[in-house]
Amino acid sequence: MAPGTKKKSDMAKFTFYKDRLMTFKNFEYDRDPDAKCTSQAVAQAGFYCTGPQSGKCAFCNKELDFDPEDDPWYEHTKRDEPCEFVRIGKLDDSELTINDTVRLSQTAMIMTKLFEHEMMINNLSNHSSSDALFDQLKKVPNTASTTKSNSRRGK
């Protein structure tokens, strides 16, 4: 990647229904003609596929295991965690405004970073020696400014 360019967030690609739906290849309940909880319903409720009966919201990082009779939208809305997708409440992409789309994409990027930082903290806390911790910290990119002040003023 060229210097100064930013990698697109992994979760931002799930802003739209069609992209979330594409993640459901072998969703178990799609084979059940009586199931209310289909891949279409789960994707429409804001989830991408994480397993044969589960999905994760790109906008609140909530992962749920579903039953065939579940209503994915209801299950999503009854969770305590605040979710931007639930707050906006538009299950049809054609109803999303540009502002809605930007907010969802930004939220997905923030949630990706939050998840990455939580994973890094968990990994760091699992290291027992200070040498192992130091090795992990060396791998973290330095985001602090490295420019020096050109001020000629005295102290």
UniProtKB/Swiss-Prot annotation:
One of its GO terms (biological process) is mitotic cell cycle. It is found in: Chromosome; Cytoplasm, Cytoskeleton, Spindle; Midbody. Disruption phenotype: RNAi-mediated knockdown results in high embryonic lethality. Causes a failure in cytokinesis resulting in a lack of cellularization and in polyploidy. Defective extrusion of the polar body during oogenesis. Defects in chromosome condensation, compromised alignment and segregation of paired homologs and defects in spindle midzone formation during meiosis and mitosis. Disruption of air-2 and hcp-1 localization to chromosomes. Decreased phosphorylation of histone H3 'Ser-10' and decreased acetylation of histone H3 'Lys-14' and 'Lys-9'. GO terms for molecular function: metal ion binding. Belongs to the IAP family. Component of the CPC complex which consists of icp-1; csc-1; bir-1 and air-2. Within the complex, interacts with csc-1, icp-1 and air-2. Interacts with csc-1 in a zinc-dependent-manner; the interaction is direct. This is Chromosomal passenger complex protein bir-1. It comes from Caenorhabditis elegans. The lineage of its organism: Eukaryota, Metazoa, Ecdysozoa, Nematoda, Chromadorea. The gene is bir-1.
